Amino acid sequence: LCLSSAVHDLLLENPDAKISVNTPFVEVFRFYRLSGICKESGQVTITWDHYRQAVEQAKESPQHVTEFFHDVLANLTGLPCSKRTLRPVIHSAANERVNPFAENKYWVVFAGGKSDIPLKLWYGPYFQQVADYLHSCGRLVVQTGRSKDRHYHLRQSIKIFDDNYKPSNIRRLFQIIKYAEGVICPITSGMHIAAAFDKPCVVIGGGREDPWWEAYNSDYGAFGGHYSGVPHKYLNTVGTDMPCCRLSGCWNRQFQNIETEGCDNFAKTVEFPGQIAHCMLAIDPSSVIAAIDSYIR
């Protein structure tokens, strides 16, 4: 998703260049002016080494992940790629320009996550309180997300949502978010799709990732200090007294146990996966509700 902003600007600035994208997420690039598969001699590859190096550099000179993709594409291709569009770009077909929930106001909630990075998960009962509040404001609450491949949803344990919508493909998810009033999620695709459609988004970020790298707003020094879209409310604990994220995100993937290193600052919970990071637990429902109010009041 974040790569799309750089590909969009690369195409704008180099209209005569033959550009293709080799990615598992081809639906993101539907309706782009792309060529077919490039010959191997003309391919460039963005690697995890590029990503990790940029994350470290951003701690000294804050930049957003979309800025990184512009820089790395310009460096690898040798083509100019000015930072014109620093949020994902998704083009919609005519049949996708319809509100899937008629005229109802609704918020999309990603309550759950992936088992391979459980540190991103927020506390289920907190989602309950936020959903109750949205209902009291006359809003529908729509949960969405995948239901396989290490993904799971809190709907399995608590029934808090008007609709537990599992889109058949990511294009349908784009449509749902495009017509939503806003999105509530941890750090996941939902926040990037919300940015693409310039939608309000409350991100429960915790302390795992650096806010300047993830947040679509001007609060952390990225975007040259000026983000042009609807600013997201990025709730996080980086820079607080928590020792694990006092200066920057920890970037751990798993909780520490006898077999693996990882986050050791967590609480036990009866919900899957059995632990919740204290940096996520520190973000309480009142903070999320206040962020929602800043958009709807």
Task: Give the location of each predicted region.
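Active-site and donor-binding regions of nucleotide-sugar-utilizing enzymes
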Residues: 1-68, 172-175, 182, 191, ...
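Donor-binding and catalytic core of enzymes assembling or modifying cell-surface/extracellular glycoconjugates
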Residues: 1-5, 121-212
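Short, well-ordered beta-to-alpha junction loops that form the rim of enzyme active sites
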Residues: 24, 111-113, 144-147
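Nucleotide-sugar donor-binding patch of glycosyltransferase catalytic domains
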Residues: 24, 195-296
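Short, aromatic/basic amphipathic alpha-helical patches
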Residues: 25-38, 151-159, 214-220
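Short acidic-hydrophobic, aromatic-tinged amphipathic segments that line or gate anion-handling sites
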Residues: 37-41, 164-165, 233-239
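Glycine-rich, N-terminal phosphate-binding loop of Rossmann-like dinucleotide-binding domains
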Residues: 49, 111-112, 187
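Mid-sequence helix-capping/hinge segment at a functional interface
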Residues: 53-124
